[in-house]
């Protein structure tokens, strides 16, 4: 089980996360409360012992180019409706691995229909990893019935409302490739070592 703990804002948080998680993420050029300047992101990326995804809602190719060049990121996570052609371009130009995020509704009236629509959209993008999220770092869970159907077709990373108390249930239900957490392992707005450790332990120990 691939476990990513996203939204580190400092070297102190990175030190906690990289003890336990397979990957982390640093948010730039976004309205997120976890947003950090590009120079800070570069320092986190260069100091890390695990992969650090450069996470952003940027839409323009030029903005992604500047961010990748300034931070020397090798992994990026796109949370916007960019043109599908951007992904192969960034891969060819910078050699980055790309996680593309897609939003899943919190409640679906027709999970099968919504899953098929989502799969059609996902297949337009040449991403290395697919993230299914509730969107905008909401800390809320989406309709897992949709995610489960998508996960039967392609490997997905699940995010949105995850925490130590529910990660086992989500993994057993959805059977994803991985899970991604941010606010669910924070206390007072900072990554908490006890919560990070417990989240990773529970995620890794699930028998599917």
Swiss-Prot record:
GO MF assignments: phosphoribosylanthranilate isomerase activity
Keyword Amino-acid biosynthesis: yes
Entry-linked InterPro entries: Aldolase_TIM, PRAI_dom, RibuloseP-bd_barrel, TrpF_fam
Any one of the GO BP annotations: L-tryptophan biosynthetic process
Annotated catalysed reactions: N-(5-phospho-beta-D-ribosyl)anthranilate = 1-(2-carboxyphenylamino)-1-deoxy-D-ribulose 5-phosphate
Pathway note: Amino-acid biosynthesis; L-tryptophan biosynthesis; L-tryptophan from chorismate: step 3/5
SUPFAM superfamilies for the chain: Ribulose-phoshate binding barrel
EC number of this enzyme: 5.3.1.24
UniProt entry keywords in alphabetical sequence: Amino-acid biosynthesis, Aromatic amino acid biosynthesis, Isomerase, Tryptophan biosynthesis
One Pfam family matching this protein: PRAI
NCBIfam families registered for this protein in UniProt: PRK01222.2-4
Family: Belongs to the TrpF family.
Official protein name in the record: N-(5'-phosphoribosyl)anthranilate isomerase
Organism: Pyrococcus abyssi (strain GE5 / Orsay)
Taxonomy of the source species: Archaea, Methanobacteriati, Methanobacteriota, Thermococci, Thermococcales
